[in-house]
Amino acid sequence: MASNIKEQAKKQFELNGQSYTYYDLQTLEEKGLAKISKLPYSIRVLLESVLRQEDDFVITDDHIKALSKFGNAGNEGEVPFKPSRVILQDFTGVPAVVDLASLRKAMNDVGGDINKINPEVPVDLVIDHSVQVDSYANPEALERNMKLEFERNYERYQFLNWATKAFDNYNAVPPATGIVHQVNLEYLANVVHVRDVDGEKTAFPDTLVGTDSHTTMINGIGVLGWGVGGIEAEAGMLGQPSYFPIPEVIGVRLTHSLPQGSTATDLALRVTEELRKKGVVGKFVEFFGPGVQHLPLADRATIANMAPEYGATCGFFPVDEESLKYMKLTGRDEEHIELVKEYLQQNHMFFDVEKEDPEYTDVIDLDLSTVEASLSGPKRPQDLIFLSDMKKEFEKSVTAPAGNQGHGLDQSEFDKKAEINFNDGSKATMKTGDIAIAAITSCTNTSNPYVMLGAGLVAKKAVEKGLKVPEFVKTSLAPGSKVVTGYLRDSGLQQYLDDLGFNLVGYGCTTCIGNSGPLLPEIEKAVADEDLLVTSVLSGNRNFEGRIHPLVKANYLASPQLVVAYALAGTVDIDLQNEPIGKGKDGKDVYLQDIWPSIQEVSDTVDKVVTPELFLEEYKNVYHNNEMWNEIDVTDEPLYDFDPNSTYIQNPTFFQGLSKEPGKIEPLKSLRVMGKFGDSVTTDHISPAGAIGKDTPAGKYLLDHDVAIRNFNSYGSRRGNHEVMVRGTFANIRIKNQLAPGTEGGFTTYWPTGEIMPIYDAAMKYKEDGTGLVVLAGNDYGMGSSRDWAAKGTNLLGVKTVIAQSYERIHRSNLVMMGVLPLQFQQGESAEALGLDGKEEISVDINEDVQPHDFVNVTAKKENGEIINFKAIVRFDSLVELDYYRHGGILQMVLRNKLAQ
């Protein structure tokens, strides 16, 4: 039943002869609950959501009142967030849809109504994560890679296609269309929804969650959204809210404008560095100030995209005139654009730089005119390097101690060379710092016509000067939508990119997520034989160790323009601002400034070729634009027929033996330590997305099931099969488990025998005798992708608790939703400080009385009988997380609730 507050807030406005209902935030000010003009715009969007969806059960007056007091009472309370839609990509989307199919089967098995297992909000899945760069630097690369993609993934695509027929409210955008976040920005996002609610046309803000951490990109157009784990997204699809504490909102005041030579990429990398230093994990970031009006929407989207890299839940740009201009540019309906403006102005959510600034938790100032051309690396996006310092910083990193900013090698590394004899008879020499991969990739940048056309102009000037890319550099161009192909073609710049080897290889994430494909065999052999430190330069958003290619140890993020420039140089061991890139056809040195376009040149090109007609043409038949997809043969049966022999799609074991009622929270006793890790362990480390080695537990499983090595595909592509994924948990070739000294990769010591073995093998031995497991970790545990399998795999290995110094937001949430207890060391304490070496038996004194952020007693019993006692913080961040944990996970809770209805 709706409350008095909600009823009083219900208002109407008229537009073009049509009446619209909306829930007026000003009502809260009239009732003395909030000063709306002082609230950050992102908080206004959340407040509208709880006001409109208040039902006096899940969302109550107390939630409205708590959020209305933002900034006045230490932000106490929690937000039940029910987004208006959900987006998925195929790597995380397949396991989400598998879980829905499994939930439906479980419902059927106990005699329940399977129609209760249907998305209750619109769901769009965009297939973008599976294409790999096998073929490149040739005109046929796109077709060859797409053909291989369908061959490798036919069974997965058949399953996803089946789901479009089996589930309501579910659509799939076919392969070779684009990258989910770019498709979302250019086409899917409405900015304001109009839906029929109780017979009334009701207007409200577009909001979403997505199963990819870079879902945050959509905040660039003023749509509030962020990445969640697949499990949380599934709960959202089924009508369950996400709960989180009322966030702090850090305001970033932008002034002035970007100078000549700097790009949106440079700004995004600078913002990432500044906000990482500030510490914004779990917080909202909102951009305001006079500099905002100097940022085209595409630049805002680039900055918003990298919110996971700066650690924030989102980086929000409120809707303003520039947002409407972008909607018009991308072919959105004129009447709808008019509605967006009218509604947001009526409801105090339309940004105007002339209005008074909101009151933020804290404010950071950033002068856009101070942004310099930059890269970041070699192993983390927040490690900013000015272009002018790149040569010096690279050389320093080679001999710096092994870690986030060093490789731990000695000076002799600079004397190494690898001689390459190509199959065509030509030869080349690679040395330390040479570039093996140069990729224009990722929605972070390919959604931005300014940097993409800028890269095309760099290529044009380079070709005209007679510059060429060395033969050992693997070049690729993988845009996030077909619109990019259209404007590069129409501008005449694609031919120059082609001349340098940046041919179109596919529409998808490719190199940015580790789908860079193989290097030439002769290069791989030479680099491996010499153990040469080679590099990559990519226009992506992540460069974590081991992510881009197993043989490439140093990876640098840069703008598409700099990717082209570095590809031409062939090395990162160069001062591009002062040293020549190469010699032109006239024999003269060519410098970066000789091939760099002016801001005006780029802007004029964008104005000329980026048109609404282009967007309308490319998106007019978006769900059926791929003939190979349309021809997939699928059944329309509502229950999926799991094939026991499939190595891609299996019915997971999460619901096996599920009781009708949840159990009680009980102490954890005599756990053994399976992993002890340092800082910055990423979800890539925990659950890799890339290649499956033949000698790994996952590789052996596939061989045992008659899968040839060439058909292994990647971990990411096999996320619908829990048997592969549990074997791949903690299996990244670069992860360093301190319990298996002298090894790199997924190994541990099995304490009963002292034997070093694969983590999966040890976990299964522990499971046989009923021993639970624990993981010890440092700061920022679980940073990176919103990879639910990092938590699912942890659960299936038998890990009962993780004890870390700090967590990245999404992974902590995912652990709880998989029934794994996240504990946090007290400030100043760590495994090392407490003297824990991993050989201990760990017990945790937790019970039904536990509350969010309580302290619990942890006991560590050493081999000699010595006892170490310490207190750890229970990282349940809301009351509902207690229920998730009690049920053994959120999906188990959803199933029990649906059965009880």
Swiss-Prot record:
Protein name per UniProt: Aconitate hydratase A
Residues binding [4Fe-4S] cluster: 443, 509, 512
Family matches, as Pfam families: Aconitase, Aconitase_C
Reactions this protein catalyses: citrate = D-threo-isocitrate; (2S,3R)-3-hydroxybutane-1,2,3-tricarboxylate = 2-methyl-cis-aconitate + H2O
Family to which this protein belongs: Belongs to the aconitase/IPM isomerase family.
GO molecular function: 2-methylisocitrate dehydratase activity; 4 iron, 4 sulfur cluster binding; aconitate hydratase activity; metal ion binding; mRNA 3'-UTR binding; mRNA binding
Annotated EC: 4.2.1.3, 4.2.1.99
Cofactors that this protein relies on: [4Fe-4S] cluster
InterPro entries, per the entry: AcnA_IRP_Swivel, Acnase/IPM_dHydase_lsu_aba_1/3, Acoase/IPM_deHydtase_lsu_aba, Aconitase/3IPM_dehydase_swvl, Aconitase/IRP2, Aconitase_4Fe-4S_BS, Aconitase_4Fe-4S_dom, AconitaseA/IPMdHydase_ssu_swvl
Entry superkingdom: Bacteria
Record organism: Staphylococcus epidermidis (strain ATCC 35984 / DSM 28319 / BCRC 17069 / CCUG 31568 / BM 3577 / RP62A)
Role: Involved in the catabolism of short chain fatty acids (SCFA) via the tricarboxylic acid (TCA)(acetyl degradation route) and probably the 2-methylcitrate cycle I (propionate degradation route). Catalyzes the reversible isomerization of citrate to isocitrate via cis-aconitate. Could catalyze the hydration of 2-methyl-cis-aconitate to yield (2R,3S)-2-methylisocitrate. The apo form of AcnA functions as a RNA-binding regulatory protein.
Keywords noted in UniProt: Iron, Iron-sulfur, Lyase, Metal-binding, RNA-binding, Tricarboxylic acid cycle
Cofactor mode of binding and number, as noted: Binds 1 [4Fe-4S] cluster per subunit.
Presence of the UniProt keyword RNA-binding in the record: yes
GO BP, sorted A to Z: propionate metabolic process, methylcitrate cycle; tricarboxylic acid cycle
UniProt pathway annotation: Carbohydrate metabolism; tricarboxylic acid cycle; isocitrate from oxaloacetate: step 2/2; Organic acid metabolism; propanoate degradation
Leading EC class: lyase
Subunit-structure text: Monomer.
Designated gene of the protein: acnA
